[in-house]
């Protein structure tokens, strides 16, 4: 623990040289510190675009408690975990959670290395009650995770978050299973989706999947949305990374909106990501 704290102080001294490491998390100006931290990273590595480095979102509310989310470069999302009586307080609290995670992300243990991959795969095998042989089988979820980690060697876990979230969503809405049935390999799926960001286009495509599910099983959308809202709130109050839960909520809400506003939301669009394009390899 002492070694971790010392590493954090060193990271703060490097990334925020004008700040006192002992006072960083007590400073009310944590919003500007978070921005300063990621601007410093961009200057050092030129990893992310300068547009929208750190994005905040306040949830509509007529009164307290207020909820605020902050999305970081690379796709990770955090929210305020305390009960906040003002929007400004919620924004500061979300920024504090994001800053703590951003600093921890700089620790050597958070970078994807061979040792990190080995430990992560072992944890995945244990959680799925599988075997280590699954890690070498790209048709399994553990094998796909192993392949994704190896494809992102050298990145930190926050930099890897967006791709990870995309595949969590594809698994959740059944797309991975559908692709497996069309004989698309997981490597092809990973290579294909690595080209895309999780944007409105991808959300619209996934919302269409859920509209089809609603037609087959009326009521499933509302059921999934209630579950997603509960998961999001629970994870936020625990100070956890939120992107997967938040995207589920956004996609399901979009699907419900389209059902009530568009008489034929299943009409294909040139803007939608096409699984046919992916499976056209075969």
From Swiss-Prot:
InterPro entries: Autophagy-related_EPG5 (IPR051436), LIX1 (IPR029270). Belongs to the LIX1 family. This is Protein limb expression 1 homolog. The lineage of its organism: Eukaryota, Metazoa, Chordata, Craniata, Vertebrata. The gene is Lix1.
């Amino acid at each position: 623990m002492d070694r971790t704290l010392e590493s954090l102080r060193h990271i703060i001294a490097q990334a925020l040289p004008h700040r006192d490491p002992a006072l960083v998390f007590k400073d009310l100006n944590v919003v500007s510190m978070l921005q300063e931290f990621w601007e410093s990273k961009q200057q050092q590595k030129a990893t992310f675009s300068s547009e929208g480095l750190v994005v905040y979102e306040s949830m509509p509310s007529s009164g307290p408690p207020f909820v605020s989310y902050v999305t970081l470069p690379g796709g990770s999302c955090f929210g305020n975990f305390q009960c906040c009586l003002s929007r400004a307080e919620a924004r500061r609290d979300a920024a504090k959670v994001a800053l703590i995670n951003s600093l921890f992300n700089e620790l050597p243990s958070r970078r994807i290395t061979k040792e990190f991959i080995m430990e992560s795969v072992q944890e995945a095998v244990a959680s799925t009650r599988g075997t280590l042989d699954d890690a070498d089988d790209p048709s399994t979820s553990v094998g796909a995770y192993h392949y994704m980690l190896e494809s992102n060697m050298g990145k930190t876990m926050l930099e890897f978050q967006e791709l990870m979230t995309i595949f969590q969503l594809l698994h959740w809405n059944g797309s991975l299973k559908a692709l497996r049935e069309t004989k698309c390999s997981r490597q092809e799926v990973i290579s294909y989706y690595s080209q895309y960001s999780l944007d409105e286009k991808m959300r619209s495509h996934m919302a269409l999947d859920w509209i089809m599910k609603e037609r087959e099983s009326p009521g499933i959308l509302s059921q999934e949305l209630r579950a997603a809202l509960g998961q999001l709130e629970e994870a936020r109050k625990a100070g956890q990374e939120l992107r997967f839960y938040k995207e589920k909520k956004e996609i399901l809400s979009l699907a419900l909106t389209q059902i009530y506003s568009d008489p034929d939301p299943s009409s294909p669009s040139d803007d939608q990501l096409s699984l046919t394009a992916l499976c056209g390899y075969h």
